[in-house]
Regions:
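Residue-level detector of structured alpha->beta connecting loops
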Residues: 118, 143, 164, 275-276
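Metal-dependent phosphoester-hydrolase catalytic domains
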Residues: 81, 131, 140, 168-175, ...
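Surface-exposed cleft-lining segments at the edges of enzyme active sites
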Residues: 173-174, 199-216, 252-257
Length: 348
């Protein structure tokens, strides 16, 4: 993954100043670059990280002022004007959720991803580490304070933030499931965050499936206790449930299986019935957009996975959401998690 430093090494100082102030046409940027053959990819990666603004220009005729979204940086036009911004892209507040599947194993990837994406707050699941061994110092060096609720080798949740973390809660209000570190809540920038790692459930015949259903029932009560009607609230994390047919690669084969079972769907629907919105689906209705792929079957390479990681937001927060994506590039890196981050951008 690229970073701000990678991008800026391609740009002469005098051009960098223009990028921040007046913007630079892509053609001029390309001519001034020390290594123009690397520029397009660097622009794309830095744009994904949220610190480049691009205004479309058709042969010198500016289009309406707007930010250009594109999935392939090769479509940049010569007259497109590029701005390098000090603040987060469009001054938006960026929140992410990511099941890292062991924070100690994934720490180099996480630190690189934080530098590239520059999120304001991140909810992590499956940190798999006791609190004393949580890499708080390394994260602080990267600009993030953290609160964690962990245990040895299993489960574990944490919240990372560039802003003060307030009103931290470890576990459920009613002390349910105290032996498992699966829920942490806090307030950041006035937004109440509930970070949850719902049990996988194993098989529908097992006690672990009953535990999963009970856990979701308790989560519903926990959300009701938050009394969130007038202030922004996000429930973020690994839900281990694919809501609909478009969220799995083979819905027929998944029928009545764990993570795609009617009882799970009914409980998940109770959350949305409270007025919580699945933010990814607010912006992207396409099928085949997954956040988890099985290592054992090479699911990522085969395009076979499930969308089981969500940002659910109440009406107040949903109204401020400008975008929500699944960052599949993080899944393509060396030693990745089996999950990809889900990122939401908000105009608070």
């Amino acid at each position: 993954m690229g970073s701000r430093k990678d991008f800026e090494t391609l740009i002469p100082d005098k051009i960098r100043k223009k990028l921040r102030n007046d913007g630079v046409p892509f053609s001029e940027l390309r001519q001034a670059s020390k290594t123009p053959e690397n520029l397009i990819e660097a622009i794309y990666r830095y744009w994904r990280g949220g610190n480049i603004r691009i205004e479309r220009n058709w042969n010198g005729i500016p289009a309406e002022a707007k930010n250009v979204s594109y999935s392939n940086s090769a479509c940049l036009l010569p007259d497109d004007r590029i701005y390098l911004e000090n603040s987060t892209f469009r001054d938006l507040w960026k929140a992410a959720t990511w099941n890292v599947n062991s924070i100690r194993t994934r720490l180099p990837l996480l630190l690189e991803w934080l530098e590239e994406q520059n999120p304001d707050v991140v909810c992590l699941q499956e940190t798999k580490v006791e609190d004393a061994q949580f890499p708080a110092w390394e994260l602080r060096q990267a600009g993030y304070e953290s609160v964690c609720y962990g245990q040895k080798s299993y489960n574990g949740v944490a919240i990372l933030s560039k802003h003060p973390i307030k009103d931290v809660q470890l576990g459920f209000h009613n002390c349910y499931d105290q032996d498992n570190a699966r829920l942490i809540a806090a307030t950041v920038s006035g937004v109440r965050l509930v970070n949850v790692y719902i049990p996988q459930g194993q098989t529908t015949e097992s006690d672990k499936f009953k535990y999963k259903l009970t856990f979701i029932e308790e989560l519903i009560q926990e959300i009701l206790a938050e009394n969130f009607s007038d202030s922004p609230l996000a429930i973020m994390g690994d839900f281990n449930i694919a809501p609909k047919a478009e969220d799995v690669s083979n819905p027929e084969a998944m029928q009545n299986k764990v993570s795609f079972h009617p009882e799970e769907h009914a409980l998940l629907a109770k959350l949305t019935d409270f007025g919580l919105c699945d933010l990814f689906r607010k912006f992207d209705p396409r099928s085949g957009q997954f956040s988890w792929w099985d290592f054992r079957t090479q699911g990522f390479e085969r395009g076979e996975g499930m969308r089981i990681d969500f940002i659910l937001a109440n009406t107040v927060l949903t109204s401020s959401c400008q975008a929500c994506i699944i960052d599949t590039e993080a899944r393509q890196q060396d030693r990745p998690s089996d999950h990809a981050p889900v990122i939401g951008e908000f105009k608070l």
